[in-house]
Amino acid sequence: MEEQPLCNLSVKDLMEAGAHFGHQTRRWNPKMKLYIFEEKNGLYIINLAKTLYQLRKALPQVCKVIKENKPILFVGTKKQAKCVIKEAAIEAGEYFVAERWLGGMLTNMTTIRNSIKTLDKIEKDLTQNSSYLTKKEIALLAKRHQKLLKNLEGIRYLKKAPGLVIVVDPSYEKIAVAEAKKLGIPVLALVDTNCDPTPIDYVIPCNDDSLKSIRLIISTIKDSIIDTKKKLGVEIVSPIKTLDIQDSEDMDVYATDEDNRQEDLLAKKYDSNEAN
């Protein structure tokens, strides 16, 4: 019999993290009724025994994706989730989207890869060819670099479609969920009482607005990924790399309308070069 991933969480741990607090009763989705314990003071209380059961049922599927040598994509762009998502993905050597989800990140990867090529070219110019650039050009390039990196750093080295997408709050990340479902990619999600669980393959009912709740559950998933990789002898490689590129905000260059126009022209130049 195959060894099951460890899940050392208890109902008490989940309760202390506030994972049981759902939304106000007037904001619920009836399809979440299965996971609700009771109504109290105008709030729905999530059945944490079911949360624990669902998590323990989902973890073997997470580990199965790792064993099949498929990447995992963490998605959480709302304020409470983004730092947790990014940290967990980096520690586990997986991929993430913690800022804005760009339409087509999964379903139109050709366009996304062109943007990544643009990012690569800008980094090369800033790190290797900067002696040929004016201070103004460097500042404009650095600004363009920051914009691209902010949205793309977590998927920059994602070479194939993920085997699993892990989402915090599918109602907030509905475009990501829709793209995953269109491609037949399973979705594991932290789902609150206001969400529709129907499109989710692995539902983890919990408070998806609490930082403590999100961190506790995502950390448990992350630990299972790391443990599985160690048992398989798989190297954990960070999905991001750090370059010594000066922040454009630190440069003594004032943004004018002409600067913005030049930035737009610069962006078009790089984009057209990659298209060719």
Curated annotation (Swiss-Prot):
One of its GO terms (cellular component) is cytosolic small ribosomal subunit. GO terms for biological process: translation. Keywords: Ribonucleoprotein, Ribosomal protein. Transmembrane segments: none annotated. One of its GO terms (molecular function) is structural constituent of ribosome. It holds the Pfam family Ribosomal_S2. InterPro entries: Ribosomal_uS2, Ribosomal_uS2_bac/mit/plastid, Ribosomal_uS2_CS, Ribosomal_uS2_flav_dom_sf. NCBIfam families: rpsB_bact. Belongs to the universal ribosomal protein uS2 family. This is Small ribosomal subunit protein uS2. The lineage of its organism: Bacteria, Pseudomonadati, Chlamydiota, Chlamydiia, Chlamydiales. The gene is rpsB.
